[in-house]
Amino acid sequence: MKKELLKLSILEAHNCLKRKEFSPTELVEAYIDEMENENLNAFVTKTQDIALEQARKVENLLLQGEKISPLAGMPIGVKDLFCTAGVRTTACSDILKNFVPSYESTISQNLWNNNACMMGKLNMDEFAMGSASSYSCFGPVKNPWKGPYGEDLIPGGSSGGSSAAVAGRLCIAAIGSDTGGSVRQPAALCGIVGAKPTYGRCSRWGMIAFASSLDQAGVLTRTVEDAAIMLQAMCGHDKKDSTSSPVDVPDFLKHISYDIKGKRIGIVREYAIPENKERECVSEMWAANLKYLQDCGAEIVDISLHHTKYALPLYYVIASSEASSNLARYDGVRYGVRREGESIDDMYELTRSLNFGEEVKRRILIGAYALSYGCYDAYYDKSQRVRRRVMQDFDEAFKKVDCILTLTTPRNFIGMDEKLEMIDRYYSDVFTVPASLAGLPAISIPSGLTKHGLPMSLQVIGKHYDEGEIFNVAAVIHKRTGDLLKHLHHF
């Protein structure tokens, strides 16, 4: 019985709870059993007692005949980037290894207000800087999927703990963060759904900052409907966050009608299918999904994003610049684990050089250089001006189409032991970064299997505040694909 509970989506589990087919405690206990035996290194802090206490609260509500939220009693994982009151929050960095916040992030509080159950904090790349979830002071995360020869695969990043936990059935859904693709890319590599809303939809209060003009909370789930339910609870104006949007949040779930007749879906002519060993499989998947969308009544429209080729380099200039500023606070005095030195300068130097990982230090240096005297105009200022051109390209495209369809990642699997140049690691975000720069909502959905039986994915990008549109198109694609997790050998 317990194993069967792990196969349910949020919507299915919610309906079962209302029919009293099982209790919230039984649902949480099923995930706790699975979590205790996990070997993915997905969780860095486990909060089983808190989850059970929250589940018992939902049981009491049901016994009293109260109406419950779709998230009530649902076992949720939280990326270790979001502050959780009384529960260690580290951003998977040595510099914050002992930090226990006294307050709750708005995003997680919104979930607990809906009576969701916190299973624990999830592993990630340090300060959300990475695409493999290998830059963590707690060690790398494993993808539940295995490679063609049984080798371990990366789960993507930086929300790799979140994607691995959902795909590995250690929680029913998880919160992640998406700065340049950190929800969508790991969702793609783990064969699940990953969505980020319009920039400003979700409050950043209590979310440890990486790049403030790009950071946005997102969700990782097994179905598009579940993503809509999660974001419905998470989104909303927050007066504690100056970048929070006051735009009303509609009922995302009601937008999923599975009717796309007459919808115009844009295909970007600058995005060619990458030249690699998976090209044939990806080409077949791409063609099959385009035909399916046309059969469902959608119109495929050719569009151009002229400046998209600059998106990746300008993203790394802007994000690294903002990171160098945001991470200046971790000096051992204001924040962070202190390393003693003979002088205050020694203390600063030792604290930051010994407590930050190599990738974080690399990006701080890139950012500090881009912001330095003599380089600011050539790098940071120019990047911001080109960013405006990227946004304008999307504005022009959306005059012709309702949404845009792309691949999510240039590769469908990467071995944990595979040696990649840094440029190749950064290239894994090539399809996801443009939407982040423009602050647009986007969702990654499973779209098929490679010849090796590994997941492939597509990304749908929408207009500002039009999450309902991308949820509906994504749901149509996911209906064709079905649940890829049933192909995982241990399920």
Curated annotation (Swiss-Prot):
It comes from Anaplasma phagocytophilum (strain HZ). PROSITE patterns: AMIDASES. Allows the formation of correctly charged Gln-tRNA(Gln) through the transamidation of misacylated Glu-tRNA(Gln) in organisms which lack glutaminyl-tRNA synthetase. The reaction takes place in the presence of glutamine and ATP through an activated gamma-phospho-Glu-tRNA(Gln). The keyword Ribosomal protein does not apply. Its EC number is 6.3.5.7. One of its GO terms (molecular function) is glutaminyl-tRNA synthase (glutamine-hydrolyzing) activity. Heterotrimer of A, B and C subunits. It is an enzyme of class 6 (ligase). Keywords: ATP-binding, Ligase, Nucleotide-binding, Protein biosynthesis. The keyword Protein biosynthesis applies. It comes from the Bacteria. It catalyses: L-glutamyl-tRNA(Gln) + L-glutamine + ATP + H2O = L-glutaminyl-tRNA(Gln) + L-glutamate + ADP + phosphate + H(+). Belongs to the amidase family. GatA subfamily. InterPro entries: Amidase, Amidase_CS, Amidase_dom, AS_sf, GatA. Pfam families: Amidase (PF01425). GO terms for biological process: translation. GO terms for cellular component: glutamyl-tRNA(Gln) amidotransferase complex. The active site is at residues 79, 158, 182. This is Glutamyl-tRNA(Gln) amidotransferase subunit A.
